[in-house]
Amino acid sequence: KAVLEFFAPAIPKIDYPAWDCLPYDRVSPSPAVSAARMAALSLLAGARGAGPLIVITTINAAIQRTPPKSVIAASAFSAAPGETVSIEALTAYLAANGYTRASTVREAGEFAVRGGLIDLYPPGADEPIRLDFFGDTLESVRAFDAATQRTTKQLDGVKLAAATEVLLTEESIARFRAGFRSAFGASNDDPVYEAVSAGRKQAGMEHWLPLFYGETATLFDFIGDGLIFLEHLVDEAANDRSAAISDHYAARADDLSAPRSRNSEVSAPSYRPLAP
């Protein structure tokens, strides 16, 4: 990245990280990683004709399935001081797009509402921002320090992307339920199935991402005909990643089919892996 800064200082650079959890894990990628990925995809989805961009990534990140480009584009939101923005509508947008309501905003993907103020930490932002409303008029947008809560600078506006790769809407929940039952049969005892059916987030639900959308994409669908530069060991890295995914899937599948002893010390519920 330092080399790119030297040779192309004027071109914006986007970091696109891989999930920081194992394939078929019981935990989700961290909020910071999910936020960074969605911020990058949102920027790329709306970047046509906006000038050159450089995306810095890894093979693990590039081949990871994502929501379709249409979903990413539809989740974008922007506003500027002087515009009419309903606080209720904005709050609903944040909740629907994976932001977590908190009393005080400290991490990416969080938001807080206090009267005519909305604090939020947009994906990809260096600092959280504070939206100051008078009624339904957005009066100002300010960046602030999460530790001190003090304003650091005034901003011309706000651009938001979804904070998570799984958006729980009526449509996506219904699609997940149908796909899960088709793949694994009736699963009323599955914690992921139960939580999603109730419209709740569940740790690790991103590992069933294809069930939430009619189609999925990868980073390459957002780049289009852009130039791609590969490190010389990319084939080896891709093969290693594919092997790791296959190994983790096989381990989960074997565990699912293995008989469970009544006296088994394994208390975790069965994990129903989606084939890669």
Which residues fall in each region the model found?
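ASCE RecA-like P-loop NTPase motor cores
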Residues: 1-276
